[in-house]
């Protein structure tokens, strides 16, 4: 029997989750870092504020604009991102990048399922909020690219990831159930 190779979609997941991991660390979660690391121009991570300001000015993203405070639901989603998505993303990147010839393991598939569900939920909520925002919050010329180019892909791809991982896990669970019934 020929050795199994990593599925092409796993390389796509690695690419997407790596981008998300970078976005979490460089944009989304900066406010959780100690202010001494980023607040002052001489701080070692001050470049992250410059990066965030560039991102906001380029995209018009109202969720990260300095002049609009976060809604409470968004603050909770950032906490979930820090406590759940970040560790899952780091684990998945390490697992998906580990070997070009190794298919995913059960634990990696379970982590992918959890990551996909949580990420889909957060991004879908942002998409819904963005969809309903008026021009007083986000300009019409920025809204479409922001919704369809930035947030929607990070809802759709994790949803596909969650379905894919659940379909991979299902035979493992069924096989385990079959073994348990024969014992």
Task: Please tell me what each predicted stretch does.
Residues 1-8, 177-183:
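Plant-biased recognition of short, low-complexity, intrinsically disordered N-terminal tails
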Residues 2-86:
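N-terminal helical submodule of small eukaryotic multi-pass membrane proteins
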Residues 4-11, 69-72, 102-106, 138-145:
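Juxtamembrane loop-transmembrane helix junctions in multi-pass integral membrane proteins
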Residues 15-26, 83-87, 113-125, 149-163:
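Hydrophobic alpha-helical cores of multi-pass transmembrane domains in eukaryotic membrane proteins
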Residues 27-38, 121-133:
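Helix-to-loop junction signature of class
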Residues 60-69, 88-98, 125-132:
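Membrane-helix exit/interface motif
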Residues 78-115:
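Signature of small four-pass
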Residues 122-183:
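Alpha-helical transmembrane segments of multi-pass integral membrane proteins
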């Amino acid at each position: 029997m020929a050795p199994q190779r990593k599925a092409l979609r796993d390389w796509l997941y690695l690419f997407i989750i790596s981008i998300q991991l970078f976005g979490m660390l460089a944009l989304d979660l900066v406010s959780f870092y100690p202010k001494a690391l980023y607040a002052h121009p001489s701080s070692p991570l001050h470049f992250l504020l410059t990066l965030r300001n560039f991102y906001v000015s380029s995209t018009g993203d109202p969720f990260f604009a300095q002049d609009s405070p976060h809604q409470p639901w968004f603050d909770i989603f950032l906490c979930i991102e820090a406590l759940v998505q970040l560790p899952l993303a780091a684990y998945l990147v390490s697992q998906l990048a580990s070997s070009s010839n190794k298919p995913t393991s059960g634990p990696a598939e379970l982590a992918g399922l959890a990551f996909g569900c949580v990420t889909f939920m957060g991004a879908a909520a942002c998409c819904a909020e963005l969809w309903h925002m008026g021009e007083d919050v986000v300009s019409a010329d920025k809204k479409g690219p922001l919704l369809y180019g930035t947030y929607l892909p990070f809802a759709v791809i994790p949803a596909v990831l969650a379905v894919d991982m659940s379909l991979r896990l299902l035979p493992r669970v069924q096989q385990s159930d079959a073994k348990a019934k024969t014992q």
